[in-house]
Structure formats: C-alpha cells, structure tokens
Amino acid sequence: MIRQVNKKAISNSLFKRLSLSGSAFANITANKKSSTHQLNQKTQLANVRFYSTKSTVIQLLNNIGSKREVEQYLKYFTSVSQQQFAVIKVGGAIITQQLNELASCLAFLYHVGLYPIVLHGTGPQINELLENEGVEPEYIDGIRITNPKTMEVVRKCFLEQNLRLVTALEKIGVHARPITAGVFEAEYLDKDKYQLVGKITSVNKSPVEAAINSGYLPILTSLAETSSGQLLNVNADVAAGELAREFEPLKIVYLNEKGGIINGNTGEKVSAINLDEEYEDLLKESWVKYGTKLKIKEIHDLLQHLPRSSSVAIIDVNDLQKELFTDSGAGTLIRRGYRLINRNSLRDFGNPDLLRNALLRDPEIKTGKVSVASYLKFLDSVQFKSYGDEPLEVLAIVVEQNDKIPKLDEFLSSKTGWLNNVTDNIFNAIKKDYSQLCWVVNENDANLPWYFSKSDGSFAKNGQILFWYGLNIDEASKLIKEFDSSSIGSSLSSSKESGVFTSAQQKRGFHHSTVRRNTNPNPPLSEGKQTERKKVALIGARGYTGQNLIKLIDNHPYLDISYVSSRELEGQKLQGYNKDNIVYSNLQIEDIKRLEENNEVDVWVMALPNGVCKPFVDTIDLVQNPNSKIVDLSADYRFDTTGEWTYGLPELNDRKTIAQAKKISNPGCYATAAQVAIAPLKEYISGTPSIFGVSGYSGAGTKPSPKNDVNLLSNNLIPYSLTDHVHEKEISSQLGLQVAFTPHVAQWFQGITHTINIPIKKGSLTSREIRNIYQDRYQGEKLITISGEAPLVKDISGKHGVVVGGFAVNSNEDRVVIVATIDNLLKGAATQCLQNINLSQEFGEYDGIPTESLIRG
C-alpha cells in the first residue's frame, strides 16, 4: 500500500539530466599532442566531476523517499528559470561553524543544475571583533547601530566571510562568484538614530543574472551603497527579503545555527507560523525580541508582497535538501496561511458555492454517483463540526452520532492544501476537539502513509482501511466488529447498500475520506503482445503526412510497406523507405479486392482527400476478411453513427476499443490538440469554449493555394473558414460540447498553436488546481506534456506529441486560458496513425515512435 520509489530508475534518469558521458575522458585522449601534465590535469578534473556527480545522485536519493517528492524535484528542475529557484540567506555563524556542510549542500544544488542566490550575514564575527577592540555592540529594535568604526569592522568581516565561502565552494569543484557590491542601492534608514545603516531602495539584478548565466553560484553580502557610493550596513534578513521580492523564487530559505525559531518559554523549536492567525499575538510574546522580532516582521512584510502560496523556511544547513525536495520539510516554516474556521451548520457557510466546490473533490460526487445536494441534505440532518481554511483548500467534517465514536466523514484537500501542510493544521485542530476519532480510507489512497501517522490503530477489509485514535482495547474491538459486519464491500460506490448517502432516517455507514490523487483512467498500452511482422498498404500517400508516415514505418520494428498507391507518382520509387525497393502503383478497385482476398495486407491506410476513400472502403468491406484493419486519415468517417468506425484518439478514447476495431478514423490535427486541451475540464465548463487556432502552411497540403503561398503568407496571418470548419464540428461532436473555432494559417511550415478561452464555474478552480487536473488526467502519457508556461509553436515543430500549458485564470475567476501546441504532420496525423496501427496489431502503442523526438515540459 505504501508506494516504493524505483531508485535505480531515478538514478538513471538523473544521470541523463546531468549529462554524464564519457566525453570528458574521450577529450583527454583525443589530442595526442597534449603534454603529460595537461593530460593528468584533465583526468583529475574528469574524475572530480564523475565522483562529485555520483555523490550528488546518492545525496538526492537519500533525501527523496516518495514518488511525490521525485515529482517535486523534477518540477523544480524544469519549471522555472535558474535565478528563480531559491534565495538562501546564510547566518554568519553557519560560515564559522558549519562551512563544510554548507559548501556540500550548495555543491549538491549546483551539480543538479539548480542555482540558488546565496546571501550571507556576518553578525557573530562582527561582535567578536568589536568586543576584542573593547567596543560594545549597540542595537535599537534589533538593528545594529553602525558608526564609522563599526562599519570598518563590518566591511572587513563581510569580505573575509564571503571569500571563505567562495573558496570552500571552489575547492569542491563549484564555480562561485563573490558579489560584495553593486546589487543593493540604499538610502539612510535614520542617520541620526542608526548612523551608517541603510534602507534598500532598489535591487540591481544584473550581477546576479550574469553570474548564473555564466554557470556560477552568486554569493552576496548585504552591504549596500548610496547613489554617491557611501557604504551602508543592511540587516541580512532584510536584504534577503528584498532579493525575494525582486526575483520571486520558488523557495526562500534562511539558514541559522539553531535550525529554526526557538520558543523562548518552552525551549522547543516552532515548527510552523501562520501569520494571518498568529502574527499579532506572536509579537506580544516576551521571548520575541531583538533579531527574532525583526526577522518575523521582515518575513511578514515580505510575504504580503508575494503569492499566498509562498513561504519562508528557517532551517539548519543539514536540512537544506530535505526542505527543498521533500514534503516533510524541516525547521520553522513561516507562511501567511489562513485562519482556520469551524462551522456547526450549513448556514455557517457564508459562500455555499465554495462548500459545493470543496465537496466536488470527493470521487463519489465528482463522478456523479452521489450528488452534492444529497450529501448536504444528510449534513442538515445530523450533528457535525467542520474544519477548513478560508478558501476551503482543505475541508474536514466530523459527524457526531449519539454515544458512538465521532467519525471523520470527509477529509478533502486540494494538492495546494497538502503541499502547504494545511492538512496537518486541520488535523491538529480536530485532535484538540476530539479525544477519540475513527475514519475509513481506501487502500489505494495516495496519502495512506499520512493517515497511518495520525492513527493509533487500523484494520483492513475488502480494500478499505479503518483508522482510529484515542480508543482503549474494548472500544477498538467493538469498532472493528461494527466495521467488519457492515455491508461495505471492496467499494463504496453502491451507496444504497452502504447507507452512506441515504436519507436522514437511515443510519449512515462508514465512508472513506477522500484525498487521493486522480490517475489516468485510460493508461497507455505501452507493452505489446505481438512481434509478428505486418504489411501496410498506403493509398494516396503522396503528401506531407504520407511522407512522415513512410519515415515512421521505415523505422518500425514490426511493420513493412507492401504497397503504396498514387496516380500522380505511379512507376516512381518510393522515397524515404529503405527496407525494400517499393515502387508507386495506381491501385484500382479490382486490385484492392484481390489483395484483400489474398490476405496480402494487414493494415490499409487511407491517406486520401476528404470524400474520396469510400469506394476503397466499400470494396474491402465486400470481401469480409476479418484479419485486416483500416485507418482513414480523412474526415469522412469521424462523424460515423453506424458503430462501424472507432474514433482513434488513444489519449481520450478507450484504447482497448480502438485495438479491437476493424475501422479506425484518425482524428484531425486541430481537433486532436483542442480536445486534449479541453477534455479534462468538461465538468467545470459553464459556456462555449473559444479556440483561436493557427497552423503552419503544410496543413494546406501540397496542392498550390493561397493558404500555402509563401509570398502571400510572408509577414501575414490568414484566417479562413470563420465558422463551421469541419474541425469545429469534430471537436464539438467528440466532446459533446459546442465549441467555437476559427482557424488561421501562418508563414511557418509545420506546427499548430491553439489559444483557448474556456468559461468555468466562477471561483471553482485556481490555476494550480487546473494544472494538477491535467497532470493527473494525462499521467503516463508519453505524447502529452503538461507545462506551467504557455508552449511555443517553434518548439513543437518536428516533435511527436501535444504540449498543454498556460492555465491562466482571470481575475474574475470564471475563465481559464489554455495554450496547446501540436505538430500537424506528426501527432496531428502520422504519429497518431501509427499509434492506432500499433493498437490494432497489438504492438506496443509507442513502437516505432522515436523517443528522442518526444517533447518534454
């Protein structure tokens, strides 16, 4: 039940990402004229690189323990520009006491291609030098008073500590760049009060970006200058905050020797601070003073200017990798958070739509097996207490039933709720109110380990796991008996039997808590059952799509072209096919009939213009050969209502149905990308999606027309078929949802981009939730990439697949804009045809599709 990570597979993948190859060693021996000294130098460098990278992989695998954490690492590795990964503020004591550990952690990040912006302080060193000279450090509100003598010491300390850290990094093969000036411009904070202390007015990003772009880790001090060049001292926490405001990194980390904020009353480390709920009371605590108070104030002000999902972690240097790459984190996490709200009746929910949207996370409700209305009716008839944050990213409902043990009836969380640990806050609040609790979870729940950690005991039956805490042996035994004798089987989908959603007069049975991640309901059939060679006949394959399909078949391990037919090219050698010497023929109806009768063709591919292939299909039908299959690339049979044709979009249509079909209609290029981009949101759509599609001129075919006239297209964009385009009908028909589609042709050769406006139920989804929906729906799909950024059409040209990204929600929260790109000749035609052929012949679905040409987000 607990997921295991294939660390060998991750290791292989990571070595590829780090470009581990023998090139370093090959280069050593390539130049025979190199001196022995130079050869030894290169060998040493290569060995350092190999061992440091191997060590990096081992460190990563030791710190990552679950699939979700692997995904989190890959997300950070690919989703942001390098300078936006993290801002790390290093306390001065770390450099003095834990320099080697700090250098090792930063080297780890460097070797996996992540470039944090490092800014260090030097407080303890300054105090030590000042005390040696008999100068007593002075502070006001946690700010060091900096007179000229103190500034002399401050500057000296900063330069020394900066050099120490840079030198330590260089010794272990990390390129580091000292940046001790030129980043922060400041004015006097209060010259009379603090003297040479600055208030930062602007941040110059150029030195930082230049360092990262050159492959160096930037190592900054918090010294600032006025416009006239006067050095000013700035608190390192404040400077780190200004950097974070400017770069908006994924992670903001403060490293200190205590590994977090220590509660001065209890001596314990504070694990989390939710500022919206705790800030004012926290500042009143007697132990919150000096640097601690300044740090909390600065972080509070910083987070007001960043997305609510942002947070600051204050940790020990040894926990840096754990904080960056795991869900568990370490140290003290400070975030804005939300105030937690308790409710005891439906009337207490000020926004009913927010409640309904939260309940839609329950799979029974989401799939329509149970309605929101029926569950609300149940809640109205029982005594319950709900727990949630303000936006209901997490909603927990505890049902109280007479003398029975209270039951956690719902625990519904968005992915945001899990990643921000709101779930822990909610559960802790429940434990304060209920000394005893029970709940049931499906054994396939992705968060099962979390539930085990919250319970005192568990009992499993028929795919469901009963959890509890706070029960003695007799109470636990009684609860297990009740659970064991209940009518719940391996599933709770039959609500009538379980009594889960029946009327108020009936007893409500156990109901599983729902937080598991949705997975792909139609996974790829990557592993084939057959390896016997099959023969393909191409009818009319003289255009761009035909050329690409021929190239794919030429590289396919089990497919051979036996016939290729074209009236215009009859008698010419088939170009681009190297397995055999094939010559174009001009097959007539009688030839088709003869070949079909003699079992000479396993797959017929109709690559003909719309409205042309019917006589060929009818002839194949007349023979009634059960062994052959037909794949039609035209639009002729995409609207079939007879049941004879199957629509071949494997990512959205049942793959087993496609595999068993005699006749497969290959989807259109525009239609494929649009359906992939819209389908996962169908249940949230509140109006007509509008699709602005632009294709390269190869989509207009090889026959000359204004739509493939390169002179007319130069510096131009030509709209056509403004309404009722055949792909508009195709998209609407397949989605069961009317869409508006306007195609355009542009001056590039191949590739399509869609910008799609989708009306959604107001406030139902955030951008992140939408992206998560797409990632879950297309999990495991090799030909679909989900990207946080809007994809570019130039990146998809020549690549196999669809890229979907953008996911921008408007300020009114009732419209999302999604961008999708596809190569119209490949996944929009030839590659998709090959997928359908593979499925029909029981090959692996991706056989013959070159993996090096798959696009990745």
UniProtKB/Swiss-Prot annotation:
It comes from the Eukaryota. The active site is at C669. Residues 341-492 form the N-acetyltransferase domain. Residues 509-532 are annotated as: Disordered. Pathway: Amino-acid biosynthesis; L-arginine biosynthesis; N(2)-acetyl-L-ornithine from L-glutamate: step 2/4; Amino-acid biosynthesis; L-arginine biosynthesis; N(2)-acetyl-L-ornithine from L-glutamate: step 3/4. One of its GO terms (cellular component) is mitochondrial matrix. This is Protein ARG5,6, mitochondrial. It comes from Candida albicans (Yeast). The gene is ARG5,6.
